[in-house]
């Protein structure tokens, strides 16, 4: 039976959704299928099922992770259903995407604890009450060996080795465990089990997303559309944002820390951060980009707005205002902040500067404390410490500063 043509209002709605959903994406595979799925959704009133798979091996969410979350929120706001797939089963293997060596497996307890952290932090962007939460152990644990052989028969070793990370490891003689080949197969099978219409991931996940599309066809399902999002560069402006590279902004960090880190984003990346990591409209983003280009907007002011926007998104309006004022006080006027945490000192005096920094939790280890002093990153009452062997006389009101944003005031 031939489908009825869309009404002018329905056609307008399809175009509206496509304009929003194409924002910031790298690739839609295939793009015409996305249009067809949205047309069907608008015609029938049935929401699309949009999947995001999570490997709960590193649960602290940073701005880089939020790129896909903002896209999911757009789908939610358009009335579609978000499928949050916790890879508790696949997490025991660990996603080998982009890895140069075999990853250690996680215990069930680690996977579950990390999954809880994900859900809590994702709720800062997504409406978790409107998202459906799934654990892939529900169906993957139920597969018998015959099912696994059937699944494995859908893919060749040659095709697996087309994956960039596997290819590099194979050519360099690095071992690849057979179980790692099952990760993309299992992730693809998740789409079969969930009957997903769309799956979203970073560009490093493209192979896995297309695996879902291929397996859905093999199992007689409608094929999902794969949408890839950019991997945002970190604060160094070169490598992708990563906690291990210490070039990240964590969404759970303190407001002043988020704001201060935003001020260190390279100028050339500001517009990308605005587009991919904030909730500002494209008209607002375009206006900022135009202002930066024609010189009517100073890069410092654009960064301050970006920092305030990020703090507002994850902490609130009041905290954003306070972070702006804190930054102006500490860095623009070169004064000390008014709310320096006070620590009652009952220890020895004098005390070795390295021990002092670790005791005050300003640095996590003596090694890092030594390096920070040697690099000129430690001040006492505004004076730079140059001697790593310095014995510090503890006096009431002594202000210890590490880097640009960490302060402690000692009271006796």
Curated annotation (Swiss-Prot):
Subunit structure: Homodimer.
Gene Ontology MF, one: RNA binding
Any one GO CC term of the record: cytosol
UniProt EC number: 6.1.1.1
Pfam families assigned to the protein according to its UniProt record, in alphabetical order: SYY_C-terminal, tRNA-synt_1b
Descriptive protein name: Tyrosine--tRNA ligase
Annotated S4 RNA-binding domain residues: 351-412
Principal subcellular localization: cytoplasm
Function: Catalyzes the attachment of tyrosine to tRNA(Tyr) in a two-step reaction: tyrosine is first activated by ATP to form Tyr-AMP and then transferred to the acceptor end of tRNA(Tyr).
Chain positions recorded as ATP binding sites: 243
Entry's localization field: Cytoplasm
Native source organism of the sequence: Halalkalibacterium halodurans (strain ATCC BAA-125 / DSM 18197 / FERM 7344 / JCM 9153 / C-125) (Bacillus halodurans)
GO biological process, one term: tyrosyl-tRNA aminoacylation
Similarity comment: family membership: Belongs to the class-I aminoacyl-tRNA synthetase family. TyrS type 2 subfamily.
Renumbered ranges of motif 'HIGH' region: 56-65
Keyword Cell inner membrane recorded: no
Classification via HAMAP family: Tyr_tRNA_synth_type2
Keywords: Aminoacyl-tRNA synthetase, ATP-binding, Cytoplasm, Ligase, Nucleotide-binding, Protein biosynthesis, RNA-binding
Chain span(s) of sequence motif 'KMSKS' region: 240-244
Catalytic activity: tRNA(Tyr) + L-tyrosine + ATP = L-tyrosyl-tRNA(Tyr) + AMP + diphosphate + H(+)
């Amino acid at each position: 039976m031939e489908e009825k043509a869309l009404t002018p209002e329905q056609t307008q709605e399809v175009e509206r959704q496509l304009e929003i959903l194409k924002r910031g994406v790298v690739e839609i595979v295939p793009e015409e299928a996305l249009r067809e799925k949205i047309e069907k959704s608008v015609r029938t009133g049935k929401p699309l099922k949009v999947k995001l798979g999570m490997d709960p091996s590193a649960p602290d969410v940073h701005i880089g992770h939020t790129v896909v979350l903002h896209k999911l929120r757009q789908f939610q706001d358009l009335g579609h259903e978000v499928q949050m797939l916790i890879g508790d089963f696949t997490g025991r293997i660990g996603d080998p995407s982009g890895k140069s060596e075999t990853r250690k497996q996680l215990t069930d307890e680690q996977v579950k604890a990390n999954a809880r952290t994900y859900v809590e932090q994702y709720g800062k962007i997504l409406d978790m009450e409107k998202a459906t939460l799934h654990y892939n152990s529900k169906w993957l644990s139920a597969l018998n060996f015959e099912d696994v052989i059937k699944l494995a028969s859908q893919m060749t070793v040659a095709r697996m080795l087309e994956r960039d990370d596997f290819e590099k490891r194979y050519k360099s003689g690095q071992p690849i465990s057979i179980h790692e080949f099952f990760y993309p197969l299992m992730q693809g099978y998740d789409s079969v089990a969930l009957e997903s219409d769309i799956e979203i991931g970073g560009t490093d996940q493209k192979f896995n997303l297309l695996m879902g599309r291929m397996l859905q066809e093999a199992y007689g399902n409608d094929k999902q559309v794969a949408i890839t999002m950019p991997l945002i560069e970190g604060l160094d402006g070169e490598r992708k944002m990563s906690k291990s590279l210490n070039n990240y902004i964590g969404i759970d960090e303190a407001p002043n820390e988020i704001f201060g880190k935003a001020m260190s984003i390279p100028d050339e990346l500001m517009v990308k951060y605005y587009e991919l990591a904030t909730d500002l409209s494209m008209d607002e983003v375009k206006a900022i980009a135009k202002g930066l280009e024609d010189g009517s907007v100073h890069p410092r002011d654009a960064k301050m707005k970006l920092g305030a926007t990020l703090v507002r998104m994850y902490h609130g309006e009041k905290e954003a205002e306070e972070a702006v004022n804190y930054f102006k006080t500490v860095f623009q006027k070169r004064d000390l902040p008014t709310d320096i945490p006070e620590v009652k000192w009952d220890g020895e005096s004098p005390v070795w500067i390295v021990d002092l920094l670790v005791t005050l939790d300003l640095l996590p280890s003596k090694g890092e404390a030594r390096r920070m002093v040697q690099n000129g990153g430690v001040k006492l009452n505004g004076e730079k410490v140059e001697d790593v062997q310095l014995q510090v006389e503890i006096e009431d009101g002594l202000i210890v500063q590490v880097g640009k944003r960490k302060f402690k005031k000692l009271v006796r």
